[in-house]
Amino acid sequence: MATDGENGRHQEVGHKSLLQSDALYQYILETSVYPREPEPMKELREITAKHPWNLMTTSADEGQFLSMLIKLINAKNTMEIGVFTGYSLLATAMALPDDGKILAMDINRENYEIGLPVIEKAGLAHKIEFKEGPALPVLDQMIEDGKYHGSYDFIFVDADKDNYLNYHKRLIDLVKIGGLIGYDNTLWNGSVVAPPDAPLRKYVRYYRDFVLELNKALAADSRIEICQLPVGDGITLCRRIS
């Protein structure tokens, strides 16, 4: 029987993939993801890899998943909270029809501008409205205006984990019935099942409780159907049903 080491199993919490085998994850990337990755996304992925915070980016397999998902639900009006250099934003923009729209929000425009030339070169900038700054005040204003209720087909959240529940309380009103909200990092480096004495990085330990709280709240929310998947760092899809 092969040992854990022989199977390529990883033990450290905080791994690039939740799969237990590096070789298996690489197989997925090289067989099904990279060969079908559009050239603009490949270019942006390679640019982002040079960024000191490159771990913040959406993985290539998750980008592929988001693209497929958006096409399956025929999304047209979307929102993204947490943009970084824009890899997931680019995946969304490429999947939307030509008249599709994305409201994209991030506290750091500088990172967004790293990917913006790629987005512009791909002819997709017209689909994106970028707002710099905290998202919560924008969401509160949209709800107060009244005209945005139930207007979004798809919303992707990959931002400050300590505000995920605050986002959910607002986004549930903005997504349409039958629409989807995707929360990223809901398995949080695998730390959601780590023992109390696990050697977690400081930021992983800090945000873990917020992720656990979110997961519990989503599971109890009767307004949505949920599906949590081990794609990337874990993504939970919430389909609004009421």
Swiss-Prot record:
Keywords: Lignin biosynthesis, Magnesium, Metal-binding, Methyltransferase, S-adenosyl-L-methionine, Transferase. It comes from the Eukaryota. It catalyses: (E)-caffeoyl-CoA + S-adenosyl-L-methionine = (E)-feruloyl-CoA + S-adenosyl-L-homocysteine + H(+). S-adenosyl-L-methionine binds at T58, E80, G82, V83, S88, D106, A135, D160. Binds 1 Mg(2+) ion per subunit. Substrate binds at K16, D158, N189. Methylates caffeoyl-CoA to feruloyl-CoA and 5-hydroxyferuloyl-CoA to sinapoyl-CoA. Plays a role in the synthesis of feruloylated polysaccharides. Involved in the reinforcement of the plant cell wall. Also involved in the responding to wounding or pathogen challenge by the increased formation of cell wall-bound ferulic acid polymers. PANTHER family: CAFFEOYL-COA O-METHYLTRANSFERASE 3 (PTHR10509:SF94), O-METHYLTRANSFERASE-RELATED (PTHR10509). This is Caffeoyl-CoA O-methyltransferase 4. The lineage of its organism: Eukaryota, Viridiplantae, Streptophyta, Embryophyta, Tracheophyta.
